Amino acid sequence: MRYLARTLFALLLVCQPGWALSSEMTRSDKALWLNVGAGALALGWGTWSWDWGAAGPRFQDEGWFGRTTGEGGADKLGHAWSGYALSHLFAYSYERFGYGRSDAARYGAYSSLGVMTAIEIGDAFSDEYGFSYQDMLFNAAGAALGYVLWEYPEINRKIDFRAEYDPFPRGKRQLDVTTDYQRLKYLIAVKADGFEEVTNPLLRYLELHVGYYARNYESYSGPGSSDRRERNVFIGVGLNVTKLLSPYVDTGGVFNYVQVPYTSINLDRNLDRR
């Protein structure tokens, strides 16, 4: 549940500034209190729900994208996506506070990395987790990508970093969908609608997808058990759901971060097929 909790408190803190922070406060004060609130809530929630303080500080080498890692690397992309999405939530708030686009992009990345780092440090004092430098690298990579795409809207119009959750595959289900890697995919979407060179109105509804996912890690219990673990890469063509729905509803940009399942045709390659 820890990643779901992180996402919820991030949304609560970052989306509420318009009404929760007094209009009489300076933008610097609003930014300060937003970050103090995020840090305090992370500390309180982590101590209560994630057993921070139950053990002494320790590091944990989780590996990268190897087949024998805990999640085949899908969790690393989950960290990157969290850092990316959180940086944009913060940047959105900073613009509402009165910061210009460049400052909002920079401070959004800093705040995202700060929150994610605080959580990782808290994990170092947990019996279950531990500080992972691999996680930290992908936290930073996600925040950096968030900075680039917010700072440069001409790139943002062309590229999205998305997570896709498909509830239908078989296997053990988790209440926390953000760590249910049996049903998650991560992808980069290149949107035809962002390129002026694409003039055909129908082609502008299409996207190129490149992504990664892992499967069957939750059912593997160790040596001697059935081992169906697999890591997959894919390339595909998808529909721009935001553009499709824009004449009818304002999606608020949510589909720039979340990929709707079954709206693309993919060619998959299993990296572990013998």
Task: Provide a role label for each language-model segment.
Residues 1-25, 274:
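Cleavable N-terminal export/targeting peptides
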Residues 21-274:
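Hydrophobic alpha-helical membrane segments
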